């Protein structure tokens, strides 16, 4: 029985090219590339850019669509997180994974965002 439990635990640990990653729970997402964890950590999704909700470059309709898509994927969900760095606003720049699904890549593949060329070297999939 102990071996079976260990096997199940091993299978359910998220793995990626980076090995086992820490788990966090997303409280909500402000927009298509910024989320907050239940611990209050602000996460800026690495390697992508999505439309802005506010400001000079605001494009509210696609921005809300990207935000809603992201919220449906990750809000109140356990996700794996690969922390990369901190940005100039103090947010953690990171990749999020739901199982084997790279959330950033999915947003780009579904048309909700684009690869952020300036930082694309931070993620294996966007190089």
Describe these PLM feature segments.
Residues 3-127:
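Small beta-barrel nucleic-acid-binding modules, primarily SNase/OB-fold domains
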């Amino acid at each position: 029985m102990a071996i079976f439990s260990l096997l199940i635990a091993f299978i359910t640990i998220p793995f990626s090219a980076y090995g086992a990653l820490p788990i966090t729970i997303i409280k909500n997402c402000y927009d298509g590339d910024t989320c907050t964890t239940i611990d209050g950590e602000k996460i800026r999704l690495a390697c992508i850019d999505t439309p802005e909700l506010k400001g000079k470059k605001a494009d509210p309709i696609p921005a809300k669509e990207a935000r809603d898509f992201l919220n449906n994927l990750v809000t109140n969900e356990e996700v794996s997180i690969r922390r990369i760095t901190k940005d100039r606003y103090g947010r953690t720049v990171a990749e999020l994974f739901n199982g084997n699904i790279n959330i950033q890549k999915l947003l780009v593949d579904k048309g909700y965002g684009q690869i952020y060329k300036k930082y694309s070297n931070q993620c294996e999939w966007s190089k």
